[in-house]
From Swiss-Prot:
Further facts: Mrp-dependent antiport apparently occurs by a secondary, proton motive force-dependent mechanism, but the similarity of several Mrp proteins to membrane-embedded subunits of energy-coupled NADH dehydrogenase complexes raises the possibility that there is a capacity for electron transport that could provide a primary energy coupling option for Mrp functions.
The protein's role, per its UniProt record: Mnh complex is a Na(+)Li(+)/H(+) antiporter involved in Na(+) and/or Li(+) excretion and Na(+) resistance. Na(+)/H(+) antiport consumes a transmembrane electrical potential, and is thus inferred to be electrogenic. Does not transport K(+), Ca(2+) or Mg(2+).
Organism whose genome encodes this protein: Alkalihalophilus pseudofirmus (strain ATCC BAA-2126 / JCM 17055 / OF4) (Bacillus pseudofirmus)
Location(s) in or outside the cell: Cell membrane
Chief location: membrane
Source superkingdom: Bacteria
Pfam families per UniProt: MbhD (PF13244), MbhE (PF20501), Proton_antipo_M (PF00361), Proton_antipo_N (PF00662)
One of the GO BP terms on file: sodium ion transport
Segments traversing the membrane: 4-22, 29-51, 80-102, 109-128, 132-154, 167-189, 209-231, 244-266, 271-293, 300-322, 332-354, 375-397, 431-453, 474-496, 529-551, 597-614, 629-651, 656-674, 679-701, 714-736, 778-795
Family: Belongs to the CPA3 antiporters (TC 2.A.63) subunit A family.
Name of the protein this chain belongs to: Na(+)/H(+) antiporter subunit A
Subunit: Forms a heterooligomeric complex that consists of seven subunits: MrpA, MrpB, MrpC, MrpD, MrpE, MrpF and MrpG.
Length: 805
């Protein structure tokens, strides 16, 4: 394995050690041990900047299941490096923050950091994997780890509810995405992302193109909380704040963004890709921003703001995909500008949203509440928290001189350029997208005002809090201060990211737009003069202030709408319906009778086999090679059939047991006739022991005054029995007939020819069981051994007098 492979899986390796560190080093906060890893990984990945900034790619492969085209291939290009740096960099700050946020005395830190490391490793696997199946495995691990982190405080009902919702929605999307990956393999013959991009013509010309696209986007939309799948994200805020700052602002919710960006070279250029991304992105942007203003909880506001910002990035990726559609017919920088804005805002969002989640956690930690109706006047009490929050909110609102202003202006520029597009009906619908995005920006500015004024201004009321409010300790402030500082640095000096981060990432998203050696020439600057984008920003500020001042007039109606979210109602109703339906089916099926369970399995087998044989016209009988049946075999068979048919009509249990034993002995006799003495001996032993055990069981049963009972005739059982006999016979005869027709020798011929040669045995039955099916037999013996151990344990427990056994 290469160093890059070890770096990818290193969080999983450290997670194995965490329980031991937690147990034997209780005096040291477990987070200090964990902190070292993401910091080292961040420094390790920084060294790749010199490679990716010149267009280089690093790739290493370890075969996993090469026969199926599945290999553990890790590769670093501009896009994967951007996400790797976000995962490890933000991860370092989040773990540092968690050390002071979570008490080592009261919290189960071993669980928390195991889950967090598992999530970090899964995210690294997602962004560094070249193989789609490996990516899918890590993708589902992110869902699992996220669910565990959300339900970290599992004693809270809302935590488990949020974890379940997150798991169900994202795993549903993951399964759909796996279907899309499978279709891509069918079209191209490879699971390699780079291989698929190289064979993109095979994808675009296939009739499976659209189904694959929709399935892949289902995975991306559910993971990145796009409308209408966004409903899991607000409920995920029940997780500890370090989890919210990490998973739901900088990493997990960006996994869908990564997938869309990574597969843009495959699907971009089609109207369906353009409109699915742009349409769902704009709706998500608008829905998230309007929902945020209706929240009363700080983390609730930030959750919906995250939904909104993810919609913004998705919209930009959709608009930027036009660069591949137009190719060299227009200036590459014209539409690729949207991709540049998406990447830049991806970074900006991680900085300002991460800092805001942390300050929200600080406020909750130090005041005991996140309810904006109780908060107020914290500006003087918590000056550092106030300063960091002000920077983050100003950036999120799109105010200069912060980085959020730059990416918001770039967003407006991309929207206006899209209206000039003479494709995808943008000449008709382009202005609608601009208007919806502008309205969403107004509400974005509005919820930033609400957070700021409701939390930090006004009169401080100590009676609203159960604790004495004070500023957070310095250790808890370090991480949000660093992120807040980056907001300012990237605002004043955005081009420090231009050729090291943004340019290489753009080349990975749009590899076919430029000729070899050409660059996108990323250049971001603050002042563009008095243009349409600036006037749009001024309009956003003015409209946002007016709505804030008129808040008393519309707030009551907005909060009323919040309590009646149709999407959450639909989810809850659907889940309740599934549970009710499952309980109904369970009551019908789980009768506690073994014969019913056998009937279910047998009926399913009959239906499946019957459909298959009728569907493919597989019924055939060939009597040319049928061996003549000897008279004594006829006698044995007739007695066998008569004994079997008599069982339902016997009204004494002991007699029925004896007849069943007779059937077993007749079967053993047939084995002797067909020269299988070992099978005959085994059958004789089994039947003898079974009959004796049943007789012994009758001895220990309670005494019954009347042993005889009246047998009941069941038509359904008769139909099932006839169906099984018919189809098993039909399969046997059809297999022989079709095999003879196709010139295929029966499989028994192989064992006849190779039993002595390959296994050194003359008894084919023994050779099959011990050699050709040796592994199967070994596992059967293992199962029997486990069952025997279980019986011994039960007997010993019973002998000790345990009444609960």
């Amino acid at each position: 394995m290469t160093v890059l492979h070890w770096a990818t899986i290193s969080p999983f390796l450290l997670a194995i050690l965490i329980p031991f560190l937690y147990k034997y080093a209780r005096r040291i906060h477990t987070g200090w041990f964990v902190l070292v890893l993401p910091l080292v990984l961040f420094i390790y990945f920084i060294q790749y900047l010199s490679i990716t900034s010149t267009g280089g790619v690093v790739e290493h492969t370890i075969p996993w299941v090469p026969s199926l085209g599945i290999n553990f291939t890790v590769f670093v290009d501009g896009l994967s490096l951007l996400f790797a740096l976000l995962i490890t960099g933000i991860g370092t700050l989040v773990i540092l923050y968690s050390i002071f946020y979570l008490s080592k005395k009261t919290e189960s830190l071993n669980n928390f950091y195991v889950y967090l490391l598992m999530f970090m490793g899964a995210m690294l696997g997602v962004v560094l994997s070249d193989n789609l199946i490996v990516l899918y495995v890590f993708w589902e691990l992110t869902s699992l780890a996220s669910s565990l982190l959300i339900s970290y405080w599992f004693h809270r009902e809302k935590s488990t509810y949020g974890a379940q919702k997150s798991m169900l929605i994202t795993v549903f999307g993951g399964f759909a995405m796996l279907g899309g990956f499978s279709l891509l393999y069918v079209m191209t013959g490879t699971f390699s992302i780079r291989g698929i991009i190289e064979n993109v013509d095979l994808v675009t010309s296939s009739e499976l193109f659209l189904p694959a696209m929709i399935l892949v986007l289902l995975g991306a939309f559910t993971k990145s909380a796009q409308f209408p799948f966004h409903i899991w994200l607000p409920d995920a805020m029940e997780a500890p704040t370090p989890v919210s700052a990490y998973l739901h602002s900088a990493t997990m919710v960006k996994a869908g963004i990564y997938l869309v960006a990574r597969l843009t070279p495959v699907f971009a250029g089609s109207a369906e890709w353009f409109w699915l991304l742009t349409g769902f992105g704009v709706v998500t942007l608008l829905w998230g921003s309007t929902s945020a203003v209706r929240q009363k909880d700080l983390k609730g506001i930030l959750a919906f703001s995250t939904v909104s910002q993810l919609g913004l990035i998705m919209t930009l990726l959709g608009l930027g995909s036009a660069a591949i559609y137009f190719g060299e017919s227009v200036d590459p920088a014209f539409y690729s500008f949207a991709i540049m804005a998406a990447i830049f805002h991806l970074i900006n969002h991680a900085t300002f949203k991460g800092s805001l989640f942390m300050t929200a956690g600080i406020i909750d930690h130090e005041t005991g509440t996140r309810d904006i109706r109780k908060l107020g006047g914290l500006m003087a009490i918590m000056p550092v928290t106030f300063t960091v929050s002000l920077i983050g909110l100003a950036s999120m609102a799109g105010l200069p001189p912060f980085n959020g202003f730059l990416s918001k202006e770039m967003f407006f520029t991309a929207l206006l350029r899209a209206t000039e597009m003479n494709a995808f009906n943008m000449e008709t619908f382009g202005i609608i997208i601009v208007v919806l995005a502008w309205i969403a920006s107004v509400f974005t500015f509005l919820y930033c005002l609400i957070m700021f004024f409701k939390t930090f201004t006004g009169k401080f009321k100590p009676e609203n809090y159960d604790v004495k409010v004070h500023e957070a300790p310095i250790g808890m402030l370090i991480s949000p201060v660093i992120l807040g500082s980056l907001v300012i640095v990237f605002g004043f000096f955005p081009n420090i990211l231009a050729y090291t981060i943004i340019e290489p990432a753009m080349q990975a998203v749009l590899p076919t737009v430029l000729a070899d050696g050409e660059l996108f020439h990323v250049n971001i600057y603050m002042w563009h003069g008095f243009n349409a984008e600036l006037f749009m920003t001024m309009g956003v500020v003015a409209a946002g202030i007016i709505l804030f001042l008129m808040m008393k007039n519309w707030a009551k109606a907005a909060f009323y709408m919040k309590e009646r979210d149709p999407l959450n109602w639909f989810y809850d109703s659907s889940l309740s319906g599934v549970i009710t339906g499952s309980q109904f089916v369970t009551r019908i099926q789980m009768t506690g009778l073994l014969r019913d369970y056998f009937a279910y399995m047998i009926v399913f087998m009959i239906l499946l086999l019957g459909y298959t044989m009728f569907r493919y016209d597989a019924f055939a009988i060939d009597t040319t090679n049928v061996t003549e049946i000897a008279p004594y075999i006829w006698v044995i068979t007739i007695v066998f059939i008569v004994a079997t048919l008599s069982i339902p009509f016997i009204n004494k249990r002991i007699t029925a047991v004896v007849v069943v034993g007779v059937i077993g002995f007749l079967l053993a006799l047939l084995f002797v006739v067909f020269r299988a003495p070992d099978l005959a001996l085994t059958q004789l032993l089994i039947e003898t022991v079974t009959v004796l055990l049943l007789m012994l069981a009758f001895y220990h049963l309670p005494e019954l005054r009347k042993e005889e009972f009246k047998p009941r005739f069941n038509v359904l059982n008769l139909i099932i029995s006839i169906g099984v006999g018919f189809f098993i016979t039909a399969i046997a005869l059809s297999s022989l007939a079709l095999g003879n027709e196709a010139g295929i020798e029966p499989i028994s011929q192989f064992f006849i020819e190779n039993s002595k040669e390959l296994a050194g045995g003359y008894n084919m039955v023994n050779v099959i069981l011990v050699d050709f099916r040796g592994l199967d037999t070994m596992l059967e013996v293992l199962v029997l051994g486990i069952a025997a151990l279980g019986v011994i344990a039960l007997i010993k427990l019973r002998m000790t007098g345990r009444e609960d056994v």
